[in-house]
């Protein structure tokens, strides 16, 4: 998950001047990384993230934008927890923060998707919503056939809100349920790059694009190499088959074969792997590849006619599966 960490590290250091965008990011981050809990009759807002820089950014924005203090607890890696996690908690002013960020609606009920002010906000707010969601639960895989930018969502409503925000940014994203969990996925390489830039991870996009291009060049080279290998194998098998047929033709015709056809046939048998053009140069006197091909074709035709009349195996009988397998 190295690329994921690179994206999150860059986004956590991004300077955002728009107050509206900062609010949208905080709201989205709390929605996708956190939860609302009732502790001793009070609403507590929590968010769990995987980088200390994200927790510090969120704590600072909550204080700067809303004036509430948050406490960050560090959960060290141990047992089933592979990595250190950071839990941000707003206890004393949890309900007020939930209302102001839009996590509660006007009647005090939890909002299941994203608040209307974020969904219907500016393009900068849509970018911020994606930034917050990715900082909360996003992942980016290495470029390849299964590369994807993905966000785990707290529910289908939040997933649909994120898909809508992506659409406003000109990015095609799909909401999916995988093993009972809601996710939003972007798979197209160009779309992933565009979304990284929109969120503010331009440096990481350049690294990702470079790796993507390297992989595509390597894949193209491999395909061409495989194509060339296949062509060489086909050519080798065709040459072996032709030599075997010519050999059988000379056996069938014996002393009755015309000299000019016999010389062309013997060249093919003696030089099984060379091209018709090279066979022509080896002939005495030299001749064109079309002339060589024509003589070999007449030799095979003459032998096959004689084999048919005499009821013996023709030249094709010399081309066995074992012969081609060894070619």
From Swiss-Prot:
GO terms for molecular function: DNA binding. Residues 275-308 bind DNA. Keywords: Cell cycle, Cell division, DNA-binding. Pfam families: HTH_WhiA, LAGLIDADG_WhiA, WhiA_N. Transmembrane segments: none annotated. One of its GO terms (biological process) is regulation of sporulation. Belongs to the WhiA family. This is Probable cell division protein WhiA. It comes from Mycobacterium ulcerans (strain Agy99). The gene is whiA.
